[in-house]
C-alpha cells in the first residue's frame, strides 16, 4: 500500500518516469520480499510466434492520453514512456495513434525469444500484459556424411544433423526406382550393403516453418566383376567376325582375351580389341582357319577376377539350309531327279504332237 501511494505521488508531481520504474519494480521478482507476489488486475498473457528474420509487433494499448507505459524483456527495461533504454537499433515503439504503445522488433533472432511485459501506469492502478515471443527458425542441415566408397557387404551409417525451431524431423530417401522408405532419424544404418543399394541418399530436414533443407550423400559400392554374357555372330572365312563380352564390376573391370592359353593383344594377327567400362569386343578383321578355336574373356578388378569362354567354330552345312542324316539328303536329291524326269517327258510329248 505504501508503494502504491508513493507511485501515485510521483505521478501527481509529474515525476511519471519514477512512477513507472517503481511499478516495474513491482513486476520483477527480485524486487519483492521472499515468498511474496503482486497480482495486478486486467493482466493478460499472450503467445506470439514469429519466423526468424521477420518483424515482430507486440501489441499494447494505453487507456487514455494521460496514462504512461513501459516495456520490459525479463528484467531489462526496453522503453519507459517515450524514452528508449535499449541500445538495440531494431526495437521501436509503434505510434499508429495516441493509444498505441506496441513494441516493434525488426529482423528478430533467436536471442529475442522469451517473455515481454507491457506495464501501463494509470491514475488508479497499474495494468500489465505479458507476451511470450517464440522465434521460429527454418531447418538447416549443418552436418552430413561425406560421399563414401565401401565394399559390398560392409555395414554403413549415414549421418544428417540439423537445427531449427521447432526441432526439425529428419527423413532419408534412396534415389532409385526401387527405393524403399526408411525410418526417420538422424542416422541411417545399412547392414551388409549390396550393389543395388549404391547411389545417392537424400536427407531432408523439415519443421513447417519454411521449405525443407535437403542435402545428398553419394555411396559407391565396390564389388567383384561378373561376366553377364559372351557371344559371337556368324563367322565366315575371309570376312570379319567378332566376339562380345558383357561384364560388370566396381571399380570397372579390366578386360583381357585369351585363345587357348595364349594371351591376345590388340593388333596381333588381324585382331582388334576394344575395351569399355562394361564391355569388351574382340574383332577378327579377316577370318582364317587359324582363328578358329576356344576364346576366353577375363574381367578383373581389385576385388576379384572372373572369366567366360566361347568356341569360335568354322561354318557348317547349316548355313546353306541343308541339314539332317544321309537318308534325308538322299531323299531330297531323289525328289529333284524325279521332278527333272517328269519335266523332260513333258517336253518330249509336246514335240511329238507338234
Curated annotation (Swiss-Prot):
Propeptide positions: 325-354
Protein origin, superkingdom: Eukaryota
Keywords: Cell adhesion, Cell membrane, Disulfide bond, Glycoprotein, GPI-anchor, Immunoglobulin domain, Lipoprotein, Membrane, Phosphoprotein, Repeat, Signal
Pfam families referenced in this protein's UniProt entry, alphabetically: I-set, Ig_3
N-terminal signal peptide: 1-37
Every Ig-like C2-type domain range: 38-134, 139-221, 225-313
Membrane topology per record: Lipid-anchor; GPI-anchor
Residues with attached carbohydrate: 73, 155, 275, 286, 294, 307
Recorded GO CC terms: dendrite; extracellular region; neuronal cell body; plasma membrane; postsynaptic density; side of membrane
GO BP field: brain development; cell-cell adhesion; cholesterol homeostasis; fat cell differentiation; feeding behavior; lipid droplet formation; locomotory behavior; neuron projection morphogenesis
InterPro entries in alphabetical order: Ig-like_dom (IPR007110), Ig-like_dom_sf (IPR036179), Ig-like_fold (IPR013783), Ig_I-set (IPR013098), Ig_sub (IPR003599), Ig_sub2 (IPR003598), IgLON_domain (IPR050876)
Residues recorded with modification Phosphotyrosine: 187
Function: May be involved in cell-adhesion. May function as a trans-neural growth-promoting factor in regenerative axon sprouting in the mammalian brain.
Family: Belongs to the immunoglobulin superfamily. IgLON family.
UniProt name for this protein: Neuronal growth regulator 1
Organism listed in the record: Homo sapiens (Human)
Amino acid at each position: 500500500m505504501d508503494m502504491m501511494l508513493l507511485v501515485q505521488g510521483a505521478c501527481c508531481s509529474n515525476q511519471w518516469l519514477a512512477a513507472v520504474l517503481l511499478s516495474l519494480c513491482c513486476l520483477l521478482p527480485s524486487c519483492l520480499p521472499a515468498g511474496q507476489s503482486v497480482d495486478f488486475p486486467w493482466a493478460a498473457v499472450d503467445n506470439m510466434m514469429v519466423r526468424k528474420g521477420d518483424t515482430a509487433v507486440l501489441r499494447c494499448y494505453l487507456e487514455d492520453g494521460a496514462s504512461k507505459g513501459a516495456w520490459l524483456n525479463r528484467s531489462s527495461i526496453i522503453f519507459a514512456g517515450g524514452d528508449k533504454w535499449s541500445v538495440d537499433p531494431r526495437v521501436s515503439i509503434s505510434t499508429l495513434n495516441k493509444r498505441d504503445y506496441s513494441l516493434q522488433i525488426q529482423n528478430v533472432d533467436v536471442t529475442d525469444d522469451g517473455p515481454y511485459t507491457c506495464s501501463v501506469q494509470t491514475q488508479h492502478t497499474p495494468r500489465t500484459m505479458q507476451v511470450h515471443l517464440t522465434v521460429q527458425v527454418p531447418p538447416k542441415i549443418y552436418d552430413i556424411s561425406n560421399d563414401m566408397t565401401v565394399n559390398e557387404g560392409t555395414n554403413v551409417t549415414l549421418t544428417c544433423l540439423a537445427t531449427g525451431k521447432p526441432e526439425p524431423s529428419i527423413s532419408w530417401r534412396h534415389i532409385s526406382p526401387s527405393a524403399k522408405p526408411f525410418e526417420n532419424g538422424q542416422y541411417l544404418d545399412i547392414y551388409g550393403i549390396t550393389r543395388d543399394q549404391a547411389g545417392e541418399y537424400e536427407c531432408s530436414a523439415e519443421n513447417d516453418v519454411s521449405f525443407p533443407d535437403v542435402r545428398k550423400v553419394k555411396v559407391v559400392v565396390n564389388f567383384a566383376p561378373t561376366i553377364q554374357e559372351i557371344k559371337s555372330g556368324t563367322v565366315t572365312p575371309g570376312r570379319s567376325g567378332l566376339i562380345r563380352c558383357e561384364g560388370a564390376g566396381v571399380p570397372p573391370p579390366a578386360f583381357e582375351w585369351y585363345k587357348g592359353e595364349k594371351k591376345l593383344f590388340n593388333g596381333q594377327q588381324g585382331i582388334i580389341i576394344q575395351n569399355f567400362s562394361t564391355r569388351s569386343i574382340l574383332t577378327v578383321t579377316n577370318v582364317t582357319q587359324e582363328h578358329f578355336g576356344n576364346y576366353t574373356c577375363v574381367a578383373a578388378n581389385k576385388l576379384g577376377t572372373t572369366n567366360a569362354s566361347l568356341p569360335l567354330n568354322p561354318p557348317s552345312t547349316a548355313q546353306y539350309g541343308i541339314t539332317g542324316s544321309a537318308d534325308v539328303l538322299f531323299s531330297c536329291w531323289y525328289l529333284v531327279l524325279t521332278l527333272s524326269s517328269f519335266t523332260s517327258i513333258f517336253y518330249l510329248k509336246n514335240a511329238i504332237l507338234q
